From Swiss-Prot:
Pathway: Carbohydrate metabolism; galactose metabolism. Belongs to the GHMP kinase family. GalK subfamily. Its EC number is 2.7.1.6. SUPFAM superfamilies: GHMP Kinase, C-terminal domain, Ribosomal protein S5 domain 2-like. It comes from Escherichia coli (strain SMS-3-5 / SECEC). This is Galactokinase. InterPro entries: Galactokinase, Galactokinase_bac, Galactokinase_CS, GalKase_N, GHMP_kinase_C_dom, GHMP_kinase_C_sf, GHMP_kinase_N_dom, GHMP_knse_ATP-bd_CS.
Amino acid sequence: MSLKEKTQSLFANAFGYPATHTIQAPGRVNLIGEHTDYNDGFVLPCAIDYQTVISCAPRDDRKVRVMAADYENQLDEFSLDAPIVAHESYQWANYVRGVVKHLQLRNNNFGGVDMVISGNVPQGAGLSSSASLEVAVGTVLQQLYHLPLDGAQIALNGQEAENQFVGCNCGIMDQLISALGKKDHALLIDCRSLGTKAVSMPKGVAVVIINSNFKRTLVGSEYNTRREQCETGARFFQQPALRDVTIEEFNAVAHELDPIVAKRVRHILTENARTVEAASALEQGDLKRMGELMAESHASMRDDFEITVPQIDTLVEIVKAVIGDKGGVRMTGGGFGGCIVALIPEELVPAVQQAVAEQYEAKTGIKETFYVCKPSQGAGQC
């Protein structure tokens, strides 16, 4: 049963009438451009064919009822006329409440709604299950009440909800690609202007995501430390963000910086340049160059930004040994575990899967999870 059928059926059973709309918003994987988003830089993600799906209908009062199919059909209910505060026990409900609360601040021309939510974006894997939920909820209200909001505004609203209501710092990339993704394309995003450029993906190339299943523990504290180090670097150059520093400017005075901060800055500057070049390589179908850029990105994350772990490095090495210069592979996401992403000619996917199955668990004691994805369309009706 599809997520659409599942949520529609649950909706009718729970609320006693049929849903009028079903909305989806996808998860994402970032092909290249890591930790560049909060430095006002460039990222190159694509939406994937794993999504959050919401069957919904408008109400003729000011009540919001939300059922979470993936959390034992837990039900949350709140009013649009009372201050929206955090739910005491359902963390999932706070993403919904946060989106609705921040949407009221942007455009309050909407009424009540009934929703049933389900999704298949793997949680805790760094594939943006939370952003896809935020964008899905925003899109539900936009569609049901014909709100004059575009995808970028729905994305910004989701980011605000996550930062301010849920209390988790994040850049804009995850929500933006979920809202604006394009089938068979990646999206080059300028995280300062929020300008986007669709970049066509080469035919016959699979987007493979492999979850190391290494439990991330440091991700919150270390993420914040990296942000602070980047801000320290920007202040040293008297610039609002590292986006505004050139590699030549950095090289001239790198020796004056704290050595750790210098390494962090070097990663951001070189990663930004790699990301812009990667968009061109993909457009030209130059998988060899794309693979080189992904390898450089991984080395930079490992050695300069220091956000990889041995399990992730092992996975990358296993995949690289199979694909050689016919594709690319690197860690993706915040770091300290999580996933790797690989662009692999479709005919090599079985060999990669076999090599990983034979070697990764033997070397690390952990069993991986393997996803073959398609670059997919952003949020909308399904």
